[in-house]
Structures are given as structure tokens and as C-alpha cells.
Amino acid sequence: MARDYPLELCRNFGIMAHIDAGKTTTTERILYYTGKSHKIGEVHDGAATMDWMEQEQERGITITSAATTTFWERTEDGKTPLTPKHRFNIIDTPGHVDFTIEVERSLAVLDGAVCLLDANAGVEPQTETVWRQADRYKVPRIVFVNKMDKIGADFFNCVKMIKDRTGATPAPIALPIGAEDKLEGIIDLVTMQEWVYQGEDLGASWIIKDVRDELKAEAEEWRGKLIELAVEQDDEAMEAYLEGNEPDVPTLRKLIRKGCLAMAFVPVTAGSAFKNKGVQPVLNSVIDYLPSPLDVPAYMGFAPGDETETRNIARSADDSQPFAALAFKIMNDPFVGSLTFTRLYSGVLKKGDQMVNSTKGKRERVGRMMMMHAINREEIDEAFAGDIIALAGLKETTTGDTLCDPANQVVLETMTFPEPVIEIAVEPKTKADQEKMGLALARLAAEDPSFRVETDFESGQTIMKGMGELHLDILVDRMKREFKVEANIGAPQVAYRETISREAEIDYTHKKQTGGTGQFARVKLVITPTEPGEGYSFESKIVGGAVPKEYIPGVEKGIKSVMDSGPLAGFPVIDFRVALIDGAFHDVDSSVLAFEIASRAAMREGLKKAGAKLLEPIMKVEVVTPEEYTGGIIGDLTSRRGMVQGQDTRGNANVINAFVPLANMFGYINTLRSMSSGRAVFTMHFDHYDAVPQNISDEIQKKYA
């Protein structure tokens, strides 16, 4: 079967935004106008199509990025198609800060993005975070200033904030006509025409007319700015413009596309998804300005087993190349079981094909292949380069793994996931729950690599670790609902760490004589602190065979065995370097085990000697509040051992930035709500580890002793 859609007619894009910028509503409108969804689901009443997990519908926030395939033809009157039908693969991404890992994963497989802004709030903290992630993955984007019907909506302030907050160059391609309850539609600056929405048909029809006289001067001024930015993309167009010849409409679109793909500027349009105004121009802009898989540079991978990870194997959007794909999301579907959402970068995949998971070196077989629409699925027999599909029945594959042709192997990605900063203990209520809980936690961990499950060796408790309170709340909730596990949940605990504060040298000899062969090993170690975040490293500086080569792995094994449980309170030890500088052995009594025991004892002694200290996770906190609550909020943050970094104004609100220990942030959301009558909001994410003050360190050591 040949491909239905040439690659130039495909768009793989995501919708990225701050929580509450209207992402789910916008996606719903897109699905409605492109004919996939027959009734519009409102987030306010919990009926949105893309938010397909129960908790998302209850909490009104988007948690998982579901992938949807739909179709659109460029149109200006809503009736006449001006381009062939394009295939859109839309990835819905969450906007809450606890879920930035989801956004990271979806950005890794997108070609372009639509960034939503709330017209009143502008560029919010989570928008900045996601914007920086998109910059890192070099994802071209367009901006939709949504909620233009809201009180206080200000399009031009949003444009200014894009420049001030992200450093990008905004290029408005449309201006809103009116705002708040006077919003009528938009002026298309490329064609210099108005789109005026009318009637009650959910925004599916509008009138195109010339720009009214009172708006002409402003529209012409902004069009002039747009043309100046666009002609910079092409020498010929620039020369013609300097000679007084403006580009015609098709040329202007081509130049805007070129600038958008090169990330020289960001096209900006406006509207209100909730009021059904301005969504179709966004769909047209996706066709006009966002990349097809052919516009994206070849994906460079490395050969499996190459420890240097030299990226010298290219895979580009071409059906004739060997098959290579990236698994970017795993979901549990109540009807099909485990679904692996996969982006094909090159080649063709057919039902029944053999493939290799090159990340793990395991074989997989293609069972069922599906194209997804939020919660509906369409079975397919074949997928092509550039497609985003779901595979059922993969046994070994987890998020971030590469799937490829067994004869032409490549590893595309090594996704890095942040360390969890918060943990809770969970205990099943009954024996029957115990088995179910093990299965549930394994499934959830396979879906979400930023979530870890561990067993505490001393207490035997199961520990869930995650990126924030909301993250763990939702996982516990899913465990109860989807897997019907009843469990007792402990209070959240902070993931402390230990490190050292000075260099120390330890000379330790392990000797044991119990009839027959004894044990003997001597090691001399130097332990040195490293910069925060550098982690652990080991080197042997042995010369002249004081410790034979074959015993050195035993030395390192002994060192590593101590790292999981530090001397102060049993937390993992981080950021130090160990050098083996001398030692001694016995021809008969020495062994790898003897050296392991010696280095373990040396390390225990050495960590104390090197001034072990306790570290705690410090969170970057941003609070957005009306002016009148600022003093109280700053006072409260300071009482939580917070260091206020500065204040800023955003619209008519104050923005407070601070670093606060995670240990003092539990339940902060409720305190903030009551202090500000529910008007202040905050976001926080992990920033760095820092030393715990001595008096608190003593308390923690007593607690964990």
C-alpha cells in the first residue's frame, strides 16, 4: 500500500501552553473544525475529547499527551479549499509544571508547535519553561494569543512580553478586531482583510471584507513591520523592497515560512477559542508556516554499543531509508492494553514486521498498529516516515527507546530524565492489594520515567518518588481508579542527599585469619568534593602494581556500595571524587572480595573524616499575586527559609521570585489560597541542592537515626 499523503502535506505539531491558557479548548475547536469531533467538549464541564483520563476531566488540567490525527485544507471563506488536504498529527501536551517531563518527551518528536498565551496574563512562568525546552529541541513555532474575550485582554502587551521574556522576535501576522466582549474577529495582515465571525454556528462561518477605515492606519503600520522582518530572509526580496516593491501575498507567505522555520522570528495571531473566533487562521498558519517532516534536518543517531555516542548515522523523512522510530509515550488503554506512541523518522513499518529495540538490544514484533484520535483508534497495516502511530503489544520497550530495522541498527535518542525530588511511602491495605499494587506501580513507571518506585531496605516499605505533590497525587489516584488498588499513603518526604565538605585521605587495611586461606587488602584513598551537580567519579593512580589490576573493580564496587547510604542519615552521597593512590596485597590471601571489603570500610571512615554534610532540594518558586497581598506573601516565604530573589510586575499583578527549600513547601497551595482569597497562583520546580542549616540537619539525623 502506498502512502496516502505526500510528506510535504504532513504536519507534526504540538500545542504548548501554561496551565489555563486554554490549550484543551483550542485543541477541541481544532478537532471540531477539522471534522473529527461532532460536539464541542468544554473543559468547564469536564467533557473534552483530548483529556481522556478521568482525573484530567475532574481537575480540568491536561496530564497526558494524547496524539491525534486529523485533516485540514487551507481556506479563507470556510467553503473553498485553497490547498490540498493536509494531515495533522497533533500532540497535546500538559501545561502544569509537575508534568514538564511530558512536554520534554513530546517536543523531542514534534516538528513544530503552536504556543498559546492567555491574552490577559501573557507569557507566564510555565510558558517560559516550555519555550526554553522548545528552543533546546529547535522546534519552530507560531503563537496564538488566546482568550482575547477576557477582561483585561491586551494583544500588544503579549507581543511585547514575548520579546522581553523569551528573547524571541514576535511577528504579528494578524491583529484582533476589538477585545473583551467587543471581540469581532481578526485582521489578516498578509492579505489585509478582516475575518468577522457571526451567528451561532460555533464559529464555523465568517465574513471576509476589506479593513475598515478606522483600523487601516494601525494595520498598515503592523503590516509594514511584518514585511520588513520577512524580506530580511531573502536578498532578492530585500533588494526589491528597498526599490519600493512590496512582496505579493504568496511571496510574503513564503518569506514568513522561511523566517519561522529558521526561528528568525515567531508569527503571532489572535482570537478566542472559547468564543470560537480566530481558530481557523491558526490552522491555516500551521499549513503555511510550520515545518513538514521534509523541512526538518536529518535526525543523527549513533551505533548501538558506541560508548562515545558519536552521532554519525543519519535518518531522514524518506520511505526508502531503513526503518527507525522513537517510542515517546506509553499509555495503558483499557481495551487494547499497553500502547506505545511512536514517531517514525525513516522507512516503512508493516504489520508483522520484526524490529529491534536498539536501546536495550531486544527484538520486538509489530502486532497491532493504530492511528489515534484522542480515545478512538483506527487500525492500520502500514506506517511511513513522518507518521505518529500507536503500537500495541510491545514487551520490552519503554519511553525514549529506539525501534529500528534489525539489519540497519541505530540509537536515536538518550532521553535524560530529572531526578525525583519528593517521595511518599505506600502500603497496600490487604494481601490482595499487594499483588495489584506491584503490577500497577510497574505499569505507571513504564509510562512515566520521571516517576520511580523503590523499596526501602530497612522498613520494607514501597516508596513512590516523583516531581511534585500534584504528580504523586495523580499517580496515587490512578492506582486507585485504574487498577482498583486500596492503599495507605504516608506523608510526603523530601529526597535529601549527603556530600562532603573537604578532602580526606584514608589508609585502611583489612585482615582476617580464620584457619586456611585468610583475607588481606590494603587501600589508600583520597576523597575530594566536586562542584555541585558533577556527580561521582573514580580513578586509579596505582603505579608499580601495588594493587594488581584485577582487584581494582573490587575497590570501586566497595566505594559504590557506600554511596546509597551516607554516614549522617542514610541518604545517597553525591558530588565527590575518589582516587586510589596506594595499597598492598598478599599473594595468597588477597581477592576481589577482600579489596571490596577494605574500600567499603575505608569509605565509611573517609566520608566522616571529609566532613559529611546534609543537602536538601531547593525549589525555584514564582508567585503571581495582586499588589495588596505582596507583603504578607514575602513574609511567609521568608518564614519558610525562602530567599526572595526579586520582584517584577506583570500586567496589574506582582511577581515574586524566590528559592525555597522543598521541605518547607508542602501544602503551600492551601496557605497561599487563604492568604490571597484564592487570587494568587504559584509555580515551582527543582533548581539545585544546597546545604541544610546545622540545627535542622541535627533534627533530621535524629529522625532517621
UniProtKB/Swiss-Prot annotation:
Q: Which UniProt keywords apply?
A: Cytoplasm, Elongation factor, GTP-binding, Nucleotide-binding, Protein biosynthesis
GO MF annotations for this entry? GTP binding; GTPase activity; guanosine tetraphosphate binding; translation elongation factor activity
Q: Main subcellular localization, coarse class? A: cytoplasm
The answer, when asked if Protein biosynthesis is one of the entry's keywords, is yes
State what protein this is by name. Elongation factor G
- Annotated binding of GTP, by residue: 17-24, 92-96, 146-149
Record organism: Cereibacter sphaeroides (strain ATCC 17023 / DSM 158 / JCM 6121 / CCUG 31486 / LMG 2827 / NBRC 12203 / NCIMB 8253 / ATH 2.4.1.) (Rhodobacter sphaeroides)
Span of domain tr-type G: 8-294
Instruction: Write out the function statement from the record.
Output: Catalyzes the GTP-dependent ribosomal translocation step during translation elongation. During this step, the ribosome changes from the pre-translocational (PRE) to the post-translocational (POST) state as the newly formed A-site-bound peptidyl-tRNA and P-site-bound deacylated tRNA move to the P and E sites, respectively. Catalyzes the coordinated movement of the two tRNA molecules, the mRNA and conformational changes in the ribosome.
Output the GO biological process annotations, alphabetical, semicolon-separated: ribosome disassembly
Q: Which Gene3D superfamilies match?
A: 3.30.230.10, 3.30.70.240, Elongation Factor G (Translational Gtpase), domain 3, P-loop containing nucleotide triphosphate hydrolases, Translation factors
Query: PANTHER family from the entry?
Result: RIBOSOME-RELEASING FACTOR 2, MITOCHONDRIAL, TRANSLATION ELONGATION FACTOR G-RELATED
Note the HAMAP family from the entry. EF_G_EF_2_B
> GO cellular component annotations, sorted alphabetically?
cytoplasm
- Say which family it is in: Belongs to the TRAFAC class translation factor GTPase superfamily. Classic translation factor GTPase family. EF-G/EF-2 subfamily.
Please name one Pfam family that this protein belongs to: EFG_IV
Keyword field contains Cytoplasm: yes
Q: Where in the cell is it found?
A: Cytoplasm
**What SUPFAM superfamilies does this protein map onto?**
EF-G C-terminal domain-like, P-loop containing nucleoside triphosphate hydrolases, Ribosomal protein S5 domain 2-like, Translation proteins
